[in-house]
Amino acid sequence: NIKMTQSAAADKVSADTDSHLRQVLTEVGIKAQILSIEPSNLPNMYQVNLAGQPPLHITADGKYVIQGDLQKNPSPRKVKQTPARATSAQAGEYVSAAVKSSILENMSALKNMSAKTPFFYTAVPGVIWGATLEGVPFLLSDDAQYITDGEISVIENGQFTGLDETFEANKNKSVFASLDESQLITYPATTTERAVIYVATDVNCPYCRMLHKQMADLNAKGVTVKTIGYPIYEASPAQMRGIWCQADEGSRRNALDKAMLQGQMTPAPASCNTDYVTPNRERAAGLAVIATPAIYREDGVLYQASFESPEFLEFLGVQ
């Protein structure tokens, strides 16, 4: 946890902090010359200005780091009082209704922000993670005055260890909990259930079709697969609406099987005027899907290798 009682921006940078951060960055192999260290406009962070590179924003303990230029939000600041700040323990939880309301009021000039935009607390109190409905992530100060398209990485034992995995997993679990379970097409394990995965899929994605061919085998190994309709290809929204419009889950599974295994699309019945795909697709924006199929364990961990390799079953704990 970050033991800071106030924003770094409220302080000048002490000699001890300056020295500590320089030491941390030298140990992890930062080659660029450090020009200066100053309070960041992101709460509880310091800005490290580098020669020839975008600045770093880093916590006083040197654990959490972001690289990127901060953009000043052009919107008028309508809410001056920032709501109560979260703690590191809330990382990966959706922000409170009060925080979301104040953020959106202060982002009125940004047309791609809406009540559907997901925002989450991060491990850095006062720094919020958000994503557009297209799934593009960004970070912002909780007063919504400064935004960057960077991500929060972690430094541990003198090494960059990549993105904050604890945050990512907790965020993804928050997203799963928000999904309408009745609009997931679920393929239950056909033996004792040993694992549950969520898969963001598109009927026209070649790798999604390849994964779907493994469905019966996965189910037989005790894996329950919950499918999130995540159309990316141009033709997919209408085609997937037809599948999700089928009357019951068995019919939906059959229609999805036909699309994935035979390339046959099932049209929506004339009586179905509801879009059952988009609500969960929008809720899933917080997953920040880069490509389909995106495969997650129910503990929120994203699988990042080939599902055709033995590693996949190892990842699921069912090898």
Residue ranges and their predicted role:
Residues 1-18, 197-212:
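Short, thiol/selenol-centered motifs that function as redox-active sites or metal-ligating centers
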Residues 3-33, 85-115:
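Short, non-transmembrane alpha-helical segments in secretory-pathway proteins
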Residues 49-98, 102, 153:
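Mid-chain, structured segments of secreted extracytoplasmic proteins
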Residues 157-186:
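N-terminal "domain-start" segment that seeds a small globular fold
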